[in-house]
Amino acid sequence: MSASHLADMLDKARHIIVEVNRNMPWGFGLNGSEINIKDVDFVVEGDDPAIAELGGGGEPSAVDRAVAELIVKEIPNGACLQLGIGGMPNAVGSLIAQSDLKDLGVHTEMYVDAFVDIAMAGKINGRCKNLDKGRQVYA
């Protein structure tokens, strides 16, 4: 289920049909983002490939890298991050992964590859977040 308005739609639905597909990614949801199987009328099992991913936005340009250096210098330990798609966010994410920053949080719409690099570098733990402490939140 999506992290948007679908929970409200389910409350008004006459029938609820879900597809279970082991090839689709799954993320732990917050209240209202999951559905109890007892509320489901029909289950369709599928093994279709995952929905095509968006491109990563390409390699950062020299300007992207220069601006990213200025941005990363302003990020404090414990900051909560949001990154988008494109050369600039890729450059920012790469520099964060290589930095001395720590205790970072994630609260973002899109979980882009740069977040994987930052997480693998041990920079993300969400310890300082006021909301959803310890969790990486994405839609």
What are these regions (language model features)?
Residues 1-139:
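Conserved phosphate- and dinucleotide-binding cores of soluble alpha/beta proteins
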